Amino acid sequence: MKSKKGLVAASGSDSEDEDSMDSPLDLSSSAASGKRRRRGNLPKESVQILRDWLYEHRYNAYPSEQEKALLSQQTHLSTLQVCNWFINARRRLLPDMLRKDGKDPNQFTISRRGAKISEASSIEAAMGIKNFMPTLEESPFHSCVVGPNPTLGRPVSPKPPSPGSILARPSVICHTTVTALKDGPFSLCQPIGVGQSTDVPQIAPSNFTDTSLVYPEDTCKSGPSPNPQSGLFNTPPPTPPDLNQDFSGFQLLVDVALKRAAEMELQAKLTA
């Protein structure tokens, strides 16, 4: 009889230890005695229902919210108790179940904490790769665009004359200047840095002179052609020139250009 009572007592203690992990910890203490209360055990029927569900879903032992609510109704436990039981069961009961099936518990997610750590490491790796990728904003393309923006370079064009050297027919001169720029060669320009010289290289005056504008009969009537160095396309001096300067050479060039334009219009009408 004594041996039977000892066996019953031992089995009872084992069952209590086994069921003790099924209940959450009770850390509340009484103010008078200061001793910790003995934690209570969940009902065996409720624990068996939870064990059966854990065994059926041992490869993915994470019940959804609907399943937790259903288990709470079946076991007559609160949802918090069901959640705590599964948290402990995944660490204590699930590895033994997987080993009995011949599976490695390390290949299955026992706790969500490991999954969060792996996700965080993958996100950090992706962010590290992104930081090393160069962007177009960090390395802009420098190109030369003809426009008023001074940071992109300066096109090769003559400087405007000073106010004292304005001619009587500025529209014709602007037209011939644009034509000469179209006929002249283009050169690449680069952004000018701080401290560099801002002088634009001069282009030979022959590039801006159209020899087809002058004919033998025109030279006989008008006399010798003016000196190309007279200052039409050259850079003006820093100080304004004398107001009494002779501009007969410029006027002669304008007259020749107007005459040539009239001849071209007449030829166009005849051919049409």
Swiss-Prot record:
Q: Which UniProt keywords apply?
A: DNA-binding, Homeobox, Nucleus, Repressor, Transcription, Transcription regulation
**Region span, Disordered:** 1-41, 216-244
InterPro entries, sorted: HD, Homeodomain-like_sf, KN_HD, TALE_homeobox
A Pfam family that this protein carries is Homeobox_KN
Q: Per UniProt, what is one GO molecular function of this protein?
A: chromatin binding
GO process terms (BP): amacrine cell differentiation; cell population proliferation; cellular response to growth factor stimulus; determination of left/right symmetry; dorsal/ventral pattern formation; fibroblast proliferation; negative regulation of cell population proliferation; negative regulation of gene expression
Where composition is biased (Low complexity), the residues are 22-33
Q: Name one GO cellular component term.
A: nucleoplasm
Locus of motif CTBP-binding motif: 24-28
Q: Which residues form a coiled coil?
A: none
Q: What is its main location?
A: nucleus
Q: Domain of life of the organism in this record?
A: Eukaryota
Compositional bias, Polar residues, is annotated for: 222-233
Gene3D superfamilies given in the database record: Homeodomain-like
Where located?
Answer: Nucleus
DNA-binding region, residues: 35-97
Subunit structure comment from the entry = Interacts with SMAD2. Interacts with CTBP, SMAD3 and HDAC1.
- Record's function text: Binds to a retinoid X receptor (RXR) responsive element from the cellular retinol-binding protein II promoter (CRBPII-RXRE). Inhibits the 9-cis-retinoic acid-dependent RXR alpha transcription activation of the retinoic acid responsive element. May participate in the transmission of nuclear signals during development and in the adult, as illustrated by the down-modulation of the RXR alpha activities.
Family stated for the protein in its record = Belongs to the TALE/TGIF homeobox family.
Protein's name in the database? Homeobox protein TGIF1
- Please report the organism this UniProt entry assigns to the protein: Mus musculus
